[in-house]
């Protein structure tokens, strides 16, 4: 089992020893790192540790995984590191390993100490007796290069291995231009300008209005045109491209395809399809109104016959539960005739309307 932890209190070595001890293991190796009281002639009071905690725990877990790959017989692994202020002679890091045999335990602990110093993002600051601010110490064992004011501006060619193998490359695939940067930039700009002019020329040919009905029509066209406002494009049915339609004037009498009849055929099929869709929409709308009135929730997968059948079943249920729905509520012929008479509208001429208005005035005068 792996035990990894970052703590801010004093590390309990006995507790860690109890975590890694096992009956099947004959060796327990423990490394304890403490704070010494001097460094380069300066008296050290304490050390302060800071860490990128989430990344540090992740890297410590990777160390445990690598230890188990290298030494599969390891039983328990414990890596504890202290953060914050660590006084002199107190423990800052503890690495403990248990294994069946001594060599695996000793070698794995030594490897874990080196790996912890080089890969885990934990930073150390030394507090001296005469300097309470302290000094951050660079980790000389980390794999990445140490940048200084001089090295940050320079490029380390020794870190990049350049393999020079140019002799076997065929000359047909290479183009060598021996000019200055200014000349090379000028050539690139000229190339781009030429390609832009070609595109503009094709746009003028494709989209510019071609009026040939009169000899003066060509002179009336503007010199510059806009493809967005002056172009005429007809979209081809069932295609993602466009057809540019032009009127052709030929001296020779040749048979040309009848484009109008072909377009009419295509448009006829489209109109028929639209009519069918409209008829289906009307039928569905009428059925939907009846279903809403009868409080029936239709299913999207049902066809029209199933929906009519559901309406009939609903009517039968209403007739069975309420007999008056069928027998007692009936409108006679007289009531129908009365409604028809009331709904009938009369037609009056202007002289008849004037007589009617004058009669109303007489009634109010009396």
UniProtKB/Swiss-Prot annotation:
This is Molybdopterin synthase catalytic subunit. CDD domains: MoaE (cd00756). One of its GO terms (cellular component) is polytene chromosome. InterPro entries: MoaE_sf, MOCS2B_euk, Mopterin_biosynth_MoaE. Its EC number is 2.8.1.12. Substrate binds at residues 101-102, 117, 124-126. One of its GO terms (biological process) is Mo-molybdopterin cofactor biosynthetic process. It is an enzyme of class 2 (transferase). One of its GO terms (molecular function) is molybdopterin synthase activity. Transmembrane segments: none annotated. SUPFAM superfamilies: Molybdopterin synthase subunit MoaE (SSF54690). Catalytic subunit of the molybdopterin synthase complex, a complex that catalyzes the conversion of precursor Z into molybdopterin. Acts by mediating the incorporation of 2 sulfur atoms from thiocarboxylated Mocs2A into precursor Z to generate a dithiolene group. Heterotetramer; composed of 2 small (Mocs2A) and 2 large (Mocs2B) subunits. It is found in: Cytoplasm. Pathway: Cofactor biosynthesis; molybdopterin biosynthesis. Keywords: Cytoplasm, Molybdenum cofactor biosynthesis, Transferase. It holds the Pfam family MoaE. HAMAP family: MOC2B. It comes from the Eukaryota. Belongs to the MoaE family. MOCS2B subfamily. PANTHER family: MOLYBDOPTERIN SYNTHASE RELATED. The keyword Cytoplasm applies. This protein is produced by a bicistronic gene which also produces the small subunit (Mocs2A). It catalyses: 2 [molybdopterin-synthase sulfur-carrier protein]-C-terminal-Gly-aminoethanethioate + cyclic pyranopterin phosphate + H2O = molybdopterin + 2 [molybdopterin-synthase sulfur-carrier protein]-C-terminal Gly-Gly + 2 H(+).
């Amino acid at each position: 089992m792996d035990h990894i932890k970052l703590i801010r209190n004093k590390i309990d070595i006995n507790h860690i020893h109890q975590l890694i001890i096992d009956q099947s293991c004959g060796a327990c190796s423990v490394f304890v790192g403490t704070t010494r009281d001097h460094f380069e002639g300066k008296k050290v009071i304490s050390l302060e540790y800071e860490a990128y905690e989430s990344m540090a725990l992740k890297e410590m877990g990777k160390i445990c995984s690598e230890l188990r790959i290298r030494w599969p017989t390891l039983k328990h692994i414990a890596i504890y590191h202290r953060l914050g202020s660590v006084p002199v002679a107190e423990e800052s890091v503890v690495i403990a390993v248990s294994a069946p045999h001594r060599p695996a335990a000793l070698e794995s602990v030594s490897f874990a100490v080196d790996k912890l110093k080089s890969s885990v993002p934990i930073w150390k600051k030394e507090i001296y007796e005469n300097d309470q601010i302290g000094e951050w110490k660079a980790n000389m064992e980390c794999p990445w290069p140490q940048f200084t004011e001089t090295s940050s501006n320079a490029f380390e060619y020794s870190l990049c291995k350049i393999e020079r193998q140019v002799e076997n490359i065929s000359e047909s695939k290479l183009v060598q231009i021996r000019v200055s940067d200014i000349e090379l930039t000028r050539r690139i700009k000229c190339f781009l300008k030429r390609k832009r002019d070609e595109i503009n020329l094709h746009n003028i040919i494709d989209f510019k209005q071609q009026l040939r009905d009169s000899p003066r029509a060509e002179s009336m066209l503007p010199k510059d045109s806009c493809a967005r406002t002056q172009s005429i494009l007809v979209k081809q049915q069932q295609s993602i491209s466009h057809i540019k339609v032009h009127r052709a004037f030929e001296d020779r009498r040749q048979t040309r395809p009848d484009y109008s009849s072909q377009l009419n055929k295509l448009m006829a099929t489209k109109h028929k399809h639209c009519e069918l869709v409209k008829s289906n929409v009307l039928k569905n709308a009428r059925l939907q109104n009846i279903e809403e009135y009868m409080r029936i929730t239709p299913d999207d997968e049902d066809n029209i016959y199933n929906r009519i059948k559901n309406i009939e079943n609903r009517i039968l249920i209403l007739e069975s539960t309420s007999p008056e729905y069928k027998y007692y509520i009936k409108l006679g012929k007289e009531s129908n005739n009365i409604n028809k008479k009331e709904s009938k509208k009369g037609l009056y001429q202007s002289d008849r309307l004037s007589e009617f208005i004058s009669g109303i005035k007489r009634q109010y005068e009396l």
